[in-house]
Amino acid sequence: MASGWDERPPWRLESLRLLPPPPLLLLLLLLRSSAQAAHIKKAEATTTTVGGSEAAEGQFDHYYHEAALGEALEAAAAAGPPGLARLFSIGNSVEGRPLWVLRLTAGLGPPPTPAAVGLDAAGPLLPGRPQVKLVGNMHGDETVSRQVLVYLARELASGYRRGDPRLVRLLNTTDVYLLPSLNPDGFERAREGDCGLGDSGPPGTSGRDNSRGRDLNRSFPDQFSTGEPPSLDEVPEVRALIDWIRRNKFVLSGNLHGGSVVASYPFDDSPEHKTTGIYSKTSDDEVFRYLAKAYASNHPIMRTGEPHCPGDEEETFKDGITNGAHWYDVEGGMQDYNYVWANCFEITLELSCCKYPPASQLRQEWENNRESLITLIEKVHIGIKGFVKDSVTGSGLENATISVAGINHNITTGRFGDFHRLLIPGSYNLTAVSPGYMPLTINNIVVKEGPATEIDFSLQPTVMSVVPDSTEAVTTPGTVAVPNIPPGTPSSHQPIQPKDFHHHHFPDMEIFLRRFANEYPNITRLYSLGKSVESRELYVMEISDNPGVHEPGEPEFKYIGNMHGNEVVGRELLLNLIEYLCKNFGTDPEVTDLVRSTRIHLMPSMNPDGYEKSQEGDSISVVGRNNSNNFDLNRNFPDQFVPITDPTQPETIAVMSWVKAYPFVLSANLHGGSLVVNYPYDDNEQGVATYSKSPDDAVFQQIALSYSKENSQMFQGRPCKDMYLNEYFPHGITNGASWYNVPGGMQDWNYLQTNCFEVTIELGCVKYPFEKELPKYWEQNRRSLIQFMKQVHQGVKGFVLDATDGRGILNATLSVAEINHPVTTYKAGDYWRLLVPGTYKITASARGYNPVTKNVTVRSEGAIQVNFTLVRSSTDANNESKKGKGHSTSTDDTSDPTSKEFEALIKHLSAENGLEGFMLSSSSDLALYRYHSYKDLSEFLRGLVMNYPHITNLTTLGQSVEYRHIWSLEISNKPNISEPEEPKIRFVAGIHGNAPVGTELLLALAEFLCLNYKKNPVVTQLVDRTRIVIVPSLNPDGRERAQEKDCTSKTGHTNARGRDLDTDFTSNASQPETKAIIENLIQKQDFSLSIALDGGSVLVTYPYDKPVQTVENKETLKHLASLYANNHPSMHMGQPSCPNNSDENIPGGVMRGAEWHSHLGSMKDYSVTYGHCPEITVYTSCCYFPSAAQLPALWAENKKSLLSMLVEVHKGVHGLVKDKTGKPISKAVIVLNEGIRVHTKEGGYFHVLLAPGVHNINAIADGYQQQHSQVFVHHDAASSVVIVFDTDNRIFGLPRELVVTVSGATMSALILTACIIWCICSIKSNRHKDGFHRLRQHHDEYEDEIRMMSTGSKKSLLSHEFQDETDTEEETLYSSKH
């Protein structure tokens, strides 16, 4: 519409001669201008009110089909000033139509040049500005939303241009995104005038579904789904929307539909999936009701609650709103996905009874919804907003968690640390948490009606780890000073009792735990074992005077509560216990001594999902007992008598991984429903209720009594008289199976599979007592809880040591005569064995050592310390090998001070928190923000070499099919000089081009090492003593074809010829890439270790990928793989949780390649077989090609593991092979454990990685005698061995002396025989001299003579017939004729 400013004035210049004098003219002009301005203002106001925007008059008389939609959005954007709007597409529909989005917010600036495409065209995010999205036309035949969002776009843009105060304020403070049509294909199939009242056409022709017949609002991942997750390949529209949501931090959203007139809010479905009538409440139910009412109350029809839609005339909605599932159950809906998986609060808005009304009704529909739409957008500013920042640098912390006490729904901060938490008026306690920072809680934040309350969080960095440890101890600073009070000293001090007695739902429990971890950092460490089915953290609070560290000789104890979600007393008691221990440490002697001498782990809730479903006051029901997959966790552990066929649950897997990672000695599993301590076994082979005695039955009775006797009601043995009249437990304890049979129980698994003794404690007859009764439960159990923990210090404890070097022996076995239950040592050789008082015969044994047996008397007060020193069984064999022969010497010491210093460093880095300390001391972390194309990768590597020429060397191993270089970067202090005595490690990635995360991680590793060289002493020493080879991209051609954010596509998986390179490593490799790797990398046979990075899951595989019956050196290969997994924050838990296989369970995160994906021709198989180098494959992420925004997190997850490989390559066995003169022998063959072969390098050096333990070594070299020895490999240091060869004097496999003697005797015998024959011949010759002799006539005499003469001469027979010695012609002739 014209504004009037460009109209030509009605008067002409020629008429100036008719004008009045100047003063009067000026007055007339002023009057005319005022009138004209008033006219314009009136016209604009009329347009806004009636037309809804400055649109052409014809905009309400038709629908926007095909390209017209994009043109209409372009026109809407043009209605505003420059820099206000960006039009972009988030993807395409099945039929290739763009999914247009118009972004409207002030300050966007001009669009980029050249123009960006796709999501990149959206423009930059703006700090502190909340994002709102409105999505229309999800069902193609529900069309009103498609139109009103275009009208809304014009209204906002033109209103901002004309200076409407409300709209200017809105777009100056809000980031608005309008997506008019999510299903453009369906819209084109739909028919105007079809109100959806009946099935008026063939199936699939209504336009509701997409072109593949999929309902988009049933195709999102669902928290209550009962079947397989939807395949996003069938719904590219949903895939595009999910990707868009993940790339942003939307705060508020509306999903616009048709077919009724009502505002619907989450949840849209329930676990029961009842068709209708189930109110499925979210944790933010009040907020959602508030948002829905805000829309409905401004809609003239919706606010009545009586839409009177044809066919549903009687349907009513109070206040015009409804809970989605209460109306009808919708599984796979978009609004629930936004709330559960993103920061976004979304409601669904049904705009009209008729789904596709005639275009003549569009103006009225716009007028009905205009105010509601604008009001809903404004509601993004309610609640609390602010920033979470680093207190040191002031930078914003992305993905920090914001939790509200009492509301079980967290949100996370955006890219700039900004957050917007929607809340209704009230008072709230907010907590901000970010990994690596101390949590911070701000209490009593008042939210009022209107604009959000502004609160900023400034978090202090911390070195506290949130990952369970599994390694040995090192000393750490920061321990708290406590008075040195003897344990038995009486004190007038009364312990401080807990005051926090109420039921803690998950958000409250989370805040409670974080508060105590924050207030008592010197004795606490809060960490998580993983997540429940519904992604709640499985928290554990560690309490120790040295948190995060296993102190050799100190036992570890655990309590686990709330395994059954509706049995809640244990959960609350453990929270009380945390408060009690923290507040009394340093002042109460008993607590102080217990914390100083014990590492305590308290897990308040193993089943947080079940707890949230349980109801206060429950005594006997099973609601909430099971986890969210409806499995009883105490029937889910492997059992000795009964095969457990149920799938192992995430909570079970997490606990099993945890228990195997720590040297737990004693444990209790806290339950409810009775009042008794129950001890193993819990079941028996017959499956009937009868006593099932374990080998340690006496020990279990003793520790069970230690708890029950401190609880007077339990000790009486007659619990729950009102419920179970005949139930009686003498002294409050019982054998589990004697009570009732429980296959798959946790306590039996602890005892049978680990060193841990566990009992199950039933804490009360009421499973979920009322809150007012909680103080009574604490008072009844507090002494029992403390006394039971003290039992960890009963029996025998000590160390098993190596007699040669005094080191502790890992996994040595302690056996007690007549008790068939051995325990094993931890990393420092420390052990604990619970026993009742008495005299025992205890034997310590270890592979490669001679066992030692001692008689031990156990007292009733405290554990007795007994150390065992074992002698290596290989000593005698080595001494035998030295007698007159070559020999081998195993030693762990060196006289070189620098070598000793480096060995000490490796031991330190192998110890607990060693790598964490190293990483904290290194330079500030890297900024990974994008992927490197082949060109960028090449330039990056050249840049490293230019900047660090003294420690880097860049070479090409060959070229790909499309002639791209396969780069190899060596990092070493002498990169161009051979140093055979140094171990050599290679890192390779990108064998599958569609999985480039590994490539980026290796580039980050290279940059990290270069940046820290000569700045960080650890990096400097590792680079100086290691030859590090990095090959970041084995398949550069495939990488160029792959697409970012494509998590499942195989595009780029193969090389340019379509060959999977990981199937081409054979003796007749056909591809140039594999030939280059084989010839220039693997066949050099000088690497000690290889790490290959891939994608598609989160685990480590070890050889072989081909199906084989046995795996040589399996123990070592699995050890290397486990080392990587254990240093990864989640990999070791064995739950990749990949969308395509969410139930996958990988024990320890490690698996043999053939057991995961069996195939022939793999790189790691070839490396082991022909390169004699162990290789493991690390799968770094479920998504093959995640967005670049995830790279920093992936680097953080894998950094420690990658660095641990640089440490590990310096362990195993270092050897030198030489002869007696000291000359090194190269190319000698070293055979380990009769299987693995390596060759000595130049200078006689060899290095091989081996799992900790005793290993056999055979050395073979041409010309030398074979040598045999044994070597003991430590977990934290290399073992050195020197093999001295003696010259091999054997001939035909026999000793030289024997061969010479026999040969001499044989020659003597031959000479003697020849002499005898000569003498005999001479005598006979003399008898026939001087005459003729008669020839023999008789044949037998002739034969006798032949036999005699043939033994001494090989002359012809005729020469012996004539004996005359004359020499006449006649005689000669005569002889010749006979």
Curated annotation (Swiss-Prot):
Modified residue annotations for Phosphothreonine: T1366, T1368
GO cellular component: extracellular space; membrane; nucleus; perinuclear region of cytoplasm; plasma membrane; trans-Golgi network
Basic and acidic residues: bias regions: 1039-1048
GO process terms (BP): cellular response to interleukin-2; peptide metabolic process; protein processing; proteolysis
Keywords: Carboxypeptidase, Cell membrane, Glycoprotein, Hydrolase, Lipoprotein, Membrane, Metal-binding, Metalloprotease, Nucleus, Palmitate, Phosphoprotein, Protease, Repeat, Signal, Transmembrane, Transmembrane helix, Zinc
Residues bound to Zn(2+) 1: H139, E142, H257
Active site: E350 (proton donor/acceptor), E762 (proton donor/acceptor)
Residues carrying sugar: 172, 217, 399, 410, 429, 522, 626, 811, 855, 867, 879, 953, 976, 1068, 1140
Lipid modification (S-palmitoyl cysteine), residues: C1315, C1319, C1321
Pfam families listed in its UniProt record: CarboxypepD_reg (PF13620), Peptidase_M14 (PF00246)
Phosphoserine modification, residue list: S270, S1356, S1359
Domain notes per entry: There are 3 carboxypeptidase-like domains. Only the first two domains seem to have kept a catalytic activity.
Stated family: Belongs to the peptidase M14 family.
Protein name, UniProt field: Carboxypeptidase D
Lineage of source species: Eukaryota, Metazoa, Chordata, Craniata, Vertebrata
The encoding gene: Cpd
